[in-house]
Amino acid sequence: INQDWNYETTQFALNATAVFELTHAVLPGMIRRKTGAICNVGSAAGNIPIPNNATYVLTKAGVNAFTEALHYELKNTGVSCTLLAPGPVRDAVIPENEKSIVDKVVPDVLWTTYESCAKETLEAMAKNRRRVVPGPLSKAMNVVSSVAPTRVLSPVMGWFYKKMS
């Protein structure tokens, strides 16, 4: 509600418009050559209505649905499309004086490393998997969002995201 409009529109352009335009730019050539792989970065957060993070959720829900739909549309074309839905990703160890508010709010055990995220993603792409969810937090969010009622989950996630802002 009280978000910076410029920040929100920039976030939309980066998270949604750029994904759509870049996919559109490379896909025709891949289909013509009958080979290629697309990996779009969505989020487990795109599966849950999260107060205090509405624009992010909007963009990631769109990327999730767009990418997973393309995965099926591209069957038998030689082109694969995988959704990467990571949780928080960073270096394994961060000095205390360099930690952001997110680093301080999200416990270390819930982060995944760049290397681990990349390895899981490349393995999933090689197997033409529809979705890859690296990291403990995103795996948990993925499961919880499929079983917990929205009326319970959304307020909890909204509180958590508000702590990070």
Q: Which positions does each model-derived feature cover?
A:
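Substrate-binding pocket helix/loop in short-chain dehydrogenase/reductase
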Residues: 1-9
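Active-site helix of classical SDR
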Residues: 23, 59
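A short helix-coil junction within the Rossmann-fold of NAD(P)-dependent oxidoreductases
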Residues: 25-34
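Alpha-helical segment proximal to the catalytic Tyr-Lys
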Residues: 28, 72-73
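Residue(s) in the substrate-gating loop at a strand-loop-helix junction
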Residues: 43
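Active-site loop immediately N-terminal to the catalytic Tyr-X3-Lys motif
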Residues: 50-54
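SDR active-site lid
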Residues: 73-136
